């Protein structure tokens, strides 16, 4: 919620789909909240408070039906619950490396459909290891979204954790 609240300070409006007492999303209420300018639905995959897993399959269908982008926060589920971006009709997926993926703190990522990459402005800007002869941020992936020196020890640690998860499963 904090990123959405931060965006609201810059004029972005959002609504919250209500939940039941046990934390289950009341998906039927989503239809009532639609406005002509609704562009996307952002949802967590599972609650960090009560563990309720959200009905992401239904949300993906809802978003497709209404032409909305669908972003899923998998901080609580990545590495523990199978996630298929295509089957869930996700446009983007955020994950943290240090929870279910068992990687180091300070790691994580944001997966986006290729079609969206050119539509998103990088949050940060800085040097890259490629195209150093120009002052412009590279337009190709992944360099477009990698300003400055990456957290190489963290990335290697996350890679090792992912390899371990693959061997264990």
What are these regions (language model features)?
Residues 1-169:
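Pyridoxal 5′-phosphate
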């Amino acid at each position: 919620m904090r990123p959405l609240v931060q965006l609201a300070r810059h004029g972005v409006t959002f609504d919250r789909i209500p939940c039941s007492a046990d934390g289950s999303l009341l998906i039927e209420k989503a239809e009532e909240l639609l406005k002509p300018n609704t562009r996307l639905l952002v949802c967590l995959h599972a609650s960090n408070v009560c563990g309720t897993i959200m009905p992401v399959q239904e949300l993906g269908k809802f978003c497709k039906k209404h032409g909305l982008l669908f972003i899923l926060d998998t901080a609580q589920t990545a590495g523990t619950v199978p996630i298929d971006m295509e089957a869930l009709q996700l446009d983007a997926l955020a994950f943290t490396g240090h929870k279910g993926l068992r990687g180091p703190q300070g790691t994580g990522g944001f997966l986006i459909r290729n079609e969206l990459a050119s539509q998103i402005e990088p949050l940060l800007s800085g040097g890259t290891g490629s195209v150093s002869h120009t002052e412009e941020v590279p337009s190709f992936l992944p360099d477009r979204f990698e300003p400055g020196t990456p957290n190489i020890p963290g990335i290697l640690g996350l890679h090792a954790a992912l390899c371990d998860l693959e061997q264990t499963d």
